Amino acid sequence: MLRREFMKTATITAALAACGDVGDESQPASRHTKLIPPGSNGTVADVNGKHIYYSVHGAGKPLILLHGGIDPDSFGQNRDTLAKGRQVIAVHLQGHGRTPDSSRALRPETLSDDVAALIGYLKLGKADVMGYSLGAGVALQTAIRHAEAVDRLVLVSGALAKDGFYPEGVAAFDQLESHASEYGRAVKDSPLGQSYPDVDWTNLFSKTGAMTKRSYDWRADVVRLRARTLLVFADADAMRPEHIVEFWKALGGGHQDAGLDGSRRPANQLAILPNATHYTLAVDPRLPDIVEEFLATT
């Protein structure tokens, strides 16, 4: 029973993980972009051959917010907290929430093409992009594949490669597809399922499981990343601590002392929240302040 409950939790969490292959006057003038009119909530954009649902919250410099797998409301109240200082554009990825599925497989790479197309559709120029878990993988791929569309990047509990996760997490990834019907039925009857009754939950778990079974390794791509980046992890995350350090070093951190004046510190930043896990990080009330401070730095 304990193993069954662990695997249920872990496989649902696996769905949250990135897997694949293949102007506000408080902001610096150089980072201004065109803004969406306030109040344009609950809109569907026809982009990249898909109907992408997004909602707009707050005003200021746009921040594209990308949820974790399965749950389009992964950030909870943090979405609205972030919107107090900027314009948050919360996107529902393919097959999630109010964005319908298509015959296309789920992959962070192709999901990132949707995000970049949405940024272009909204005529934002460059936007800050923040993602959690699956959304972190999509955000990272957006910055890799569409560097012209991304200003700053916030990656919350994302991995460079599948081998960055603990072995039990990898095992959960590999079993998710085979349990799709079981988990789909469970979610359909949950508050999440009731909030989004049009989602085919079994299909979503099946396609997510097919994605999470695939190996991926983005190490070679990350070293060429141009977007200024904030990594956020929990002290008890789903990723091995060695992998977190590896990710940080790939972004230029952890190579030398910053010096008394901080002049040798990297442009990118790392935050590790204590008393947190992969499962609590997106809704952690400490997260918005960390993100806002990073986005506001010159």
Question: How would you describe each model-predicted region?
Answer:
Residues 5-23:
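N-terminal export signals
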Residues 50-98:
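Conserved HGGG/HGGXW glycine-rich cap/lid loop of the alpha/beta-hydrolase fold
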Residues 90-130:
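Active-site loop/oxyanion-hole signature of alpha/beta-hydrolase fold enzymes
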Residues 140-145, 153-187:
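Flexible "cap/lid" loop of the alpha/beta hydrolase fold
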Residues 206-221:
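Active-site nucleophile elbow and catalytic-triad environment of alpha/beta-hydrolase enzymes
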Residues 225, 231-233:
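Short beta-strand/loop motif that positions the catalytic acidic residue
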Residues 238-269, 273-274:
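Conserved loop-alpha-helix segment in the C-terminal half of the alpha/beta-hydrolase fold
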Residues 266-298:
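Catalytic active-site module of serine/aspartate enzymes centered on a nucleophile-bearing elbow/loop
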